[in-house]
């Protein structure tokens, strides 16, 4: 079902952890000013792992950027560009698992973040939720991208798609609550936040050791981002253009990804059925408003097979759903068909009841030329969602807590 993806991740079926040889990524080249510019940013340890995997895979048509508060981890990451966040604050020693440190470090580096990313049309942000740098810094990165575009008078703001992992239950309640708040903070400034629930991932491959499971999560994110990027940028069996992706993902709120593979006699249909069954987030179908479906296929797959598979998607999601799809040929797939379904506008308990009403419009603000001091700005109030005071119990009513914070917004406009 997903064994080909495991193989491509360098995870053997016998659970041998020896990685397979990977290809080297070409240098990023973006000389054509009329080209859609795509940037992929990995924030924190988990995000850096995804960027490294994308670099090894050789994703074409996108610039890869790694950001971290840990200088040693950043040194080992593979990317076209790297940025150490909050150098004067953390001295390159990391966040210690504290989202507030990640947030402060990103705030102190806001100008550098803007300059490193530059002007882009589509930005993917990858991070792990529940720890320090990814949880605290990723929302700041998303905000800076939007603010730079507004500050520069861009007619259309960049499309920001965040792709994050949600921790295992056995990682503890504290980390889970940090992750929920981090996702909610990301929703303020991302158009769409794709959430991959680690426990759901483990259900697909229950016998994997924990380190291989994390690598599998990196592979899913990397393949998803690579697939969308190259289907936009390169000639494909069926292209998805940037306008299609923008239509589905703009103001999409929270999103899930489902993944499936098959080499059966009815492989495309079975791959889609598996993808719809293998949801990597706890949601009910029917709650999503829009969907993006991407197929990775071998050279002998026909368009008729793909069309038949898409009929399953239309039947499952309903006539009123807006659905875009594309397909790319990958010689390594052989007889296998892989389907990835991204559904936006979903409701999940991991985003505080699943409501997207708190996805606020970006406030006008100039990019800081110097690090901010104190905690009095609009962004600092938003950050209180991430960094909750120690006297608040993890099981407290976070919904009420956020609403109380949002009550201050009117005073800031």
From Swiss-Prot:
<comment type="function">
    <text>Essential cell division protein that forms a contractile ring structure (Z ring) at the future cell division site. The regulation of the ring assembly controls the timing and the location of cell division. One of the functions of the FtsZ ring is to recruit other cell division proteins to the septum to produce a new cell wall between the dividing cells. Binds GTP and shows GTPase activity.</text>
</comment>
<keyword id="KW-0132">Cell division</keyword>
<feature type="binding site">
    <location>
        <position position="175"/>
    </location>
    <ligand>
        <name>GTP</name>
    </ligand>
</feature>
<dbReference type="InterPro" id="IPR003008">
    <property type="entry name" value="Tubulin_FtsZ_GTPase"/>
</dbReference>
<protein>
    <recommendedName>
        <fullName>Cell division protein FtsZ 2</fullName>
    </recommendedName>
</protein>
<dbReference type="InterPro" id="IPR018316">
    <property type="entry name" value="Tubulin/FtsZ_2-layer-sand-dom"/>
</dbReference>
<dbReference type="Pfam" id="PF00091">
    <property type="entry name" value="Tubulin"/>
</dbReference>
<dbReference type="InterPro" id="IPR000158">
    <property type="entry name" value="Cell_div_FtsZ"/>
</dbReference>
<dbReference type="GO" id="GO:0043093">
    <property type="term" value="P:FtsZ-dependent cytokinesis"/>
</dbReference>
<dbReference type="GO" id="GO:0005737">
    <property type="term" value="C:cytoplasm"/>
</dbReference>
<feature type="binding site">
    <location>
        <begin position="132"/>
        <end position="134"/>
    </location>
    <ligand>
        <name>GTP</name>
    </ligand>
</feature>
<dbReference type="Pfam" id="PF12327">
    <property type="entry name" value="FtsZ_C"/>
</dbReference>
<dbReference type="GO" id="GO:0051301">
    <property type="term" value="P:cell division"/>
</dbReference>
<keyword id="KW-0342">GTP-binding</keyword>
<dbReference type="GO" id="GO:0005525">
    <property type="term" value="F:GTP binding"/>
</dbReference>
<keyword id="KW-0963">Cytoplasm</keyword>
<comment type="similarity">
    <text>Belongs to the FtsZ family.</text>
</comment>
<dbReference type="InterPro" id="IPR008280">
    <property type="entry name" value="Tub_FtsZ_C"/>
</dbReference>
<dbReference type="InterPro" id="IPR020805">
    <property type="entry name" value="Cell_div_FtsZ_CS"/>
</dbReference>
<dbReference type="GO" id="GO:0003924">
    <property type="term" value="F:GTPase activity"/>
</dbReference>
<dbReference type="InterPro" id="IPR036525">
    <property type="entry name" value="Tubulin/FtsZ_GTPase_sf"/>
</dbReference>
<dbReference type="InterPro" id="IPR024757">
    <property type="entry name" value="FtsZ_C"/>
</dbReference>
<keyword id="KW-0717">Septation</keyword>
<dbReference type="GO" id="GO:0051258">
    <property type="term" value="P:protein polymerization"/>
</dbReference>
<feature type="binding site">
    <location>
        <position position="218"/>
    </location>
    <ligand>
        <name>GTP</name>
    </ligand>
</feature>
<keyword id="KW-0547">Nucleotide-binding</keyword>
<keyword id="KW-0131">Cell cycle</keyword>
<comment type="subunit">
    <text>Homodimer. Polymerizes to form a dynamic ring structure in a strictly GTP-dependent manner. Interacts directly with several other division proteins.</text>
</comment>
<dbReference type="InterPro" id="IPR045061">
    <property type="entry name" value="FtsZ/CetZ"/>
</dbReference>
<feature type="binding site">
    <location>
        <position position="171"/>
    </location>
    <ligand>
        <name>GTP</name>
    </ligand>
</feature>
<dbReference type="GO" id="GO:0032153">
    <property type="term" value="C:cell division site"/>
</dbReference>
């Amino acid at each position: 079902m997903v064994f080909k993806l495991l193989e491509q991740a360098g995870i053997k079926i016998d659970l041998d952890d020896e990685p397979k040889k990977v290809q080297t990524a070409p240098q990023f080249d973006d000389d054509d000013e009329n080209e859609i510019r795509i940037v992929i940013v990995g924030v924190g340890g988990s995000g850096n792992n995804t960027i490294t995997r994308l670099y090894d895979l050789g994703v074409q048509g996108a610039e890869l950027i790694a950001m971290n508060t840990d200088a040693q981890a950043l040194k080992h990451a593979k990317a076209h560009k790297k940025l150490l966040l909050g150098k004067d604050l953390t001295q390159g020693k990391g966040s210690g698992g504290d989202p507030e440190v990640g947030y402060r470090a990103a705030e102190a580096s806001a100008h550098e973040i803007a300059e490193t990313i530059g002007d882009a049309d589509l930005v993917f942000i990858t991070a792990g939720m529940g720890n320090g740098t990814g949880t605290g810094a990723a929302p700041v990165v998303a905000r800076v991208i939007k603010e730079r575009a507004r500050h520069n008078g861009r007619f259309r703001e960049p499309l920001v798609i965040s792709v994050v992992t949600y921790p295992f239950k056995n990682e503890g309640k504290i980390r889970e609550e940090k992750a929920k708040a981090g996702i909610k903070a990301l929703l303020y400034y991302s158009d769409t936040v794709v959430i991959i629930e680690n426990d759901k991932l483990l259900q697909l491959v229950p016998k994997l050791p924990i380190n291989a499971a994390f690598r599998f999560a990196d592979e899913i994110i990397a393949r998803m981002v690579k697939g969308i990027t190259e289907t936009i940028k390169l000639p494909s069996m069926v292209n998805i253009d940037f306008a299609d992706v923008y239509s589905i993902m703009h103001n999409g709120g929270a999103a899930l990804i489902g993944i499936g593979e098959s080499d059966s006699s009815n492989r495309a249909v079975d791959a889609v059925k598996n993808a719809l069954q293998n949801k990597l987030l706890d949601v009910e179908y029917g709650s999503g408003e829009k969907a993006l479906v991407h197929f990775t296929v071998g050279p002998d797959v026909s368009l008729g097979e793909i069309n038949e598979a898409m009929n399953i998607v239309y039947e499952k999601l309903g006539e009123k759903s807006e659905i875009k799809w594309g397909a790319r040929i990958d010689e390594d797939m052989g007889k296998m068909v892989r389907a990835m379904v991204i559904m936006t506008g979903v409701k999940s308990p991991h985003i505080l009841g699943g409501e997207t009403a708190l996805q606020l419009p970006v406030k006008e603000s100039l990019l800081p030329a110097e690090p901010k001091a104190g905690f009095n700005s609009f962004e600092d109030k938003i950050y209180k969602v991430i960094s909750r005071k120690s006297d608040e119990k993890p099981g407290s009513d976070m919904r009420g807590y956020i609403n109380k914070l949002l009550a201050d917004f009117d005073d800031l406009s």
